[in-house]
């Protein structure tokens, strides 16, 4: 009953921090937003988003309570519908199942992911006759949860969670800076660019020599999609839908499937927090396409906390500009939609881990203001004062 009381008061207080698209952001760039710094049960967190697509396909949310902290980053593809659906349902399901089970566990997270997938698939099956495009909409899904000193990371797709932790190994090898902060990847990229993922798919589909194809130097499942696990992408999980409809065979699914070629079963990592653990970076692949794990961790470790998520976004944009041989200032003036030619939507949540090192989060650093982006807060304390992106 104690766990039930800890979770139930938080289950229906979802406050939207703005409306999606336009407005806010740093001077000269209306497509970036951030929550500079707020408190959670184990420290502080910082959030930032940069829109590149015509419709923002990334979604993010943070839940804060005395019992637990949840972080979600959802990177949509084919449209924003799946990511928005996950943003609406997943945390409620995690809270519901955690209350029933007496707390968060790997089983709770897997069950919540599975129920979210089932609900979205059911919604698609109702909608596709009037909106066939919805069959090809999907979302990567990355969730982090902290409860009772344990960190859980559940993942579908290629969004990524990277821990920054202090290492004492340098002294043993005669190097300076024995307490430097080093990265530890907490999630697995379900992307066929990874040879292990390609091998896994080939083993699951031994009778399909075209299960993964390299087109223009990029590996894709059936030559179509790079990620192997997601919420949605119903046309790649329910072959019977396309088989029964000639029109869909010509448009949405122009190839026969013997069986589903994608999965919604998450990879889940459980880790007891340790005194040397400093922070976790949760981000969509828009960040990781531009920055290595090492570079991202070094930026956070060497920067002030306030606005650190935005600092990562700007570093990614700088790298995108360098790759395209254009000035960073030019990217900041490019409209949504066109900006996708330079970088993807980028979403970053940096979660600092103070309490496990004997230091509580600082409530006086909570700040927020209105901004039109779908960054959600589920904190009970935010019912009358929702988390809102800060004008930077």
Swiss-Prot record:
Keyword check for Hydrolase: yes
InterPro entries named among the record's database cross-references: PP2C, PP2C_BS, PPM-type-like_dom_sf, PPM-type_phosphatase-like_dom
Free-text remark on how the cofactor is bound: Binds 2 magnesium or manganese ions per subunit.
EC number(s) recorded for this UniProt protein: 3.1.3.16
PANTHER family the record matches: PROTEIN PHOSPHATASE
Similarity comment: family membership: Belongs to the PP2C family.
SUPFAM superfamilies in alphabetical order: PP2C-like
Name of the protein in question: Probable protein phosphatase 2C 29
Binding-site positions, Mn(2+) 1: 75-76
Domain of life: Eukaryota
Region span, Disordered: 360-392
Record-level Gene Ontology MF annotations: metal ion binding; protein serine/threonine phosphatase activity
Catalytic function, reaction form: O-phospho-L-seryl-[protein] + H2O = L-seryl-[protein] + phosphate; O-phospho-L-threonyl-[protein] + H2O = L-threonyl-[protein] + phosphate
Pfam entry (one): PP2C
CDD domains the UniProt entry points to: PP2Cc
Residues annotated as binding Mn(2+) 2: 75, 285, 344
Keyword annotations of the record: Hydrolase, Magnesium, Manganese, Metal-binding, Protein phosphatase
Keyword Metal-binding found: yes
Cofactor: Mg(2+); Mn(2+)
Gene Ontology BP annotations: regulation of intracellular signal transduction
């Amino acid at each position: 009953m104690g766990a039930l009381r800890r979770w139930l008061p938080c289950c229906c207080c979802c406050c939207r921090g703005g409306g999606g698209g336009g407005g806010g952001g740093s001077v000269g760039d209306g497509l970036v937003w951030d929550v500079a710094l707020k408190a959670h049960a184990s420290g502080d967190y910082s959030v930032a988003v940069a829109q590149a697509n015509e419709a923002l396909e990334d979604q993010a949310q943070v839940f804060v309570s005395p019992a637990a902290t949840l972080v979600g980053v959802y990177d949509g593809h084919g449209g924003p519908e799946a990511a928005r659906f996950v943003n609406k349902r997943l945390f409620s399901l995690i809270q519901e199942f955690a209350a029933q089970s007496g707390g968060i566990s790997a089983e709770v997270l897997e069950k919540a992911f599975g129920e979210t997938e089932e609900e979205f698939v059911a919604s698609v099956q109702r909608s596709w006759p009037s909106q066939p495009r919805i069959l090809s909409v999907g979302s990567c899904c990355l969730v982090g949860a902290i409860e009772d000193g344990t960190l859980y990371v559940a993942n579908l797709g290629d969004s990524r969670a990277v821990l920054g932790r202090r290492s004492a190994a340098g002294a043993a090898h005669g190097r300076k800076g024995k307490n430097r902060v080093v990265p530890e990847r907490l999630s697995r990229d379900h992307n066929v660019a990874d040879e292990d993922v390609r091998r896994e798919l080939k083993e699951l589909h031994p009778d399909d020599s075209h299960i993964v194809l390299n087109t223009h130097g990029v590996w894709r499942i059936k030559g179509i999609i790079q990620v192997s696990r997601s919420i949605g992408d119903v046309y790649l999980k329910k072959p019977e839908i396309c088989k029964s409809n000639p029109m869909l065979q010509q448009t949405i699914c122009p190839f026969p499937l013997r069986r589903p070629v994608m999965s919604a079963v998450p990879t889940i990592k459980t880790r007891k927090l340790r005194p040397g653990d400093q922070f976790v970076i949760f981000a969509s692949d828009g960040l990781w396409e531009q920055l290595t794990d090492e570079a991202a961790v070094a930026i956070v470790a060497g920067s002030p906390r306030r606005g650190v998520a935005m600092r990562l976004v700007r570093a990614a944009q700088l790298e995108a500009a360098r790759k395209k041989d254009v000035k960073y200032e030019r990217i900041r003036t490019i409209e949504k939609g066109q900006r996708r030619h330079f970088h993807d939507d980028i979403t970053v949540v940096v979660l600092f881990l103070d309490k496990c090192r004997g230091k509580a989060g600082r409530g006086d650093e909570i700040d927020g203001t209105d901004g039109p982006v779908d960054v959600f807060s589920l904190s009970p304390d935010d019912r009358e004062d929702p988390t809102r992106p800060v004008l930077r």
